[in-house]
Amino acid sequence: VVLPSGYVFYSDSIRLKKNVDLHIQKGATIKATSNIDGYIRPNKLINDPKTALIGNPVTGKPSFVFIYAYEADGCSISGEGTIDANGHAFVARKDQYYVTGDFYPRPTVMYVEKSNHISFRDFTVVDAPFWTLHPAGCDDVLIDKIRILNDLDVANSDGIDPDHCSNVRILGCHVTCADDCICLKASKGNSEYGP
């Protein structure tokens, strides 16, 4: 799937499929919706929308995700274009010194679950409202020369969070964020994938 240069594509959530490359050409931008109803909800433990809005996804699976893949071996995102996560739609400036993100929902930008032989190459992500790239239960993950440029006032806007993954290579990336640039995780929410 190719997003051609010179366009901004406004989108609800995207579900990556097996062996599909989402290629964002240089000069193309895909911008996440500000409408929370347009997001995929992978956290099957949350059935009550009110709980999803106040629940903290740090220890569980994300409540809302912009780009999602499940059992999508060989999927990838590539190209020199931009993913604009539209994070400021989900946080508010409390005062001149502090942006609050203590309320939810705050969607994860990319959550790839139980998928092997996957890659993320060359693109830029800006303005994440929460974690940026969260592979979980994956094997053979390549993250190569991506740039993550998040607002330094937005708490928990982690860069790259491999969670219960194996054989992960992170090469030549640039990450600017208000929390962990790279954090290896073994979260409770993804414990089904082992250590």
Identify the meaning behind each predicted range.
Residues 1-195:
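Extracellular/periplasmic carbohydrate-active domains that bind, remodel
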